[in-house]
């Protein structure tokens, strides 16, 4: 039986720190240095704290989920378009569909239910737990366990998750690490990172209303991940 593959990747943004309630601000700021002792260090670490809000599903949210079928070279990006309501569009076999966070998470888990193999870059430790928490916040139950059995590559029955960040570092055994950009560079794959858009620029792009640009960047991520998987599949995957 042919296994149905799904490459996936997400984009997130953090909350606006200044708009948070005071109790939450104080809780987040507990570890900051004494402002009266070192104002410069305090301000520096406060800015870093604000920058890192995106990395927690408690202080951030999903604004794009990209999915891609590497066998058919087709995919979709479900993305948050703010208050605008753009028409669905398709560019180079990638559909772009505007949705709110709850809708895109519901769509992802519906797709997950009918796929067998999942491919990501750093998805087991980052994307999947993030989506699971955000899903629970919206009252959505995941349909697959994509975090368990890391070393065996086995998750829930009939589901396999290939996290390339883990696999290419031999599950942490190797002394080196690499970003998706560096792995793509090494294998001659077009990198999704550009001067205009990269992971650390998504937050500002979202504030600026560049929703489709973020979605297109996410599409480049899933395509690059699919190409990187092809290298791993051909040259690293154990032959059974």
Report the location of each language-model feature.
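Metal-dependent phosphoesterase core characteristic of DEDDh/y 3'-5' exonuclease domains
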Residues: 2-4, 60-63, 67-94, 98, ...
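Alpha-helix capping and helix-coil boundary motifs
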Residues: 29-48, 93-96, 100, 142, ...
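Entry/capping segment at the start of metal-dependent catalytic domains
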Residues: 1-60, 73-75
């Amino acid at each position: 039986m042919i296994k149905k593959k799904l490459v996936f990747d997400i984009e997130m943004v953090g909350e606006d720190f200044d708009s948070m309630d005071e109790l939450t601000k104080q809780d987040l700021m507990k570890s900051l240095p004494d402002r009266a002792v070192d104002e410069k260090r305090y301000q520096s670490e406060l800015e870093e704290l604000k920058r890192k809000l995106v990395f927690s599903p408690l202080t951030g949210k999903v604004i794009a989920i990209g999915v891609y079928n590497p066998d058919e070279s087709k995919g979709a990006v479900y993305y948050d378009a703010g208050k605008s309501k753009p028409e669905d569009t398709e560019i180079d076999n990638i559909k772009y569909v505007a949705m709110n966070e709850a809708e895109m998470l519901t769509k992802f888990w519906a797709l997950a239910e009918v796929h067998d193999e999942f491919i990501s870059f750093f998805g087991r430790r980052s994307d999947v737990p993030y989506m699971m928490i955000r899903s629970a916040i919206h009252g959505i139950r995941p349909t697959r366990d994509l975090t368990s059995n890391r070393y065996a590559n086995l998750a829930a029955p009939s589901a396999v998750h290939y996290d390339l960040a883990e696999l290419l570092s031999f599950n942490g055994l190797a002394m080196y690490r690499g970003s998706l950009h560096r792995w793509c560079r090494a294998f001659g794959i077009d990198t999704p990172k550009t001067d205009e858009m990269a992971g650390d620029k998504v937050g500002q792009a979202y504030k600026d209303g560049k929703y489709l640009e973020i979605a297109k960047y996410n599409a480049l991520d899933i395509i690059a991940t699919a190409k990187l998987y092809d290298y791993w599949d051909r040259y690293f995957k154990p032959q059974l």
